[in-house]
């Protein structure tokens, strides 16, 4: 019997590598569960998929329309709140709008006036939430949760493997790594 099972895949635009102990012959099954979990989270939160919660919040920015969110999304937003506060607002998932203002080498492509207008669309505090929904207050605002969702996804896969009584595993998503055993 093969001692380990592994798979390489992409999630959230990053290379992933999963290795699980196959001592009980369930390695392939467990990898499929992990792959399904990553796909579920990507479909739900990726900024680049049009039907995700994130994209729907971005599409409704400035309309006053709240996009329904579940407990998992509220929990992720709470986690991001903590990151935003701990970083003294340096970490801010609403800065994606600024990425086109600069070249890959850091040169400013937008005029100072354009940049000033775009900076008015930045601010995590402008993601307004209720118990059932969320929306961005300003038209043109957008959030990008990909930098937050990768560690969350890594932890989610690790918890899934622990729930399935896996004793040894290695989970890598780009530069984020977790292990069991």
Language-model segments: residues:
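A contiguous, well-ordered beta/alpha segment that forms the leading edge of an enzyme domain
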Residues: 1-146, 159-170
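Short, electropositive, low-hydrophobicity segments enriched in small/polar residues
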Residues: 17, 155, 178
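Conserved acidic catalytic centers in enzymes
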Residues: 88, 150, 174
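A conserved glycine-rich
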Residues: 147-157
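Beta-rich nucleic-acid/ligand-interaction surfaces
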Residues: 175-181
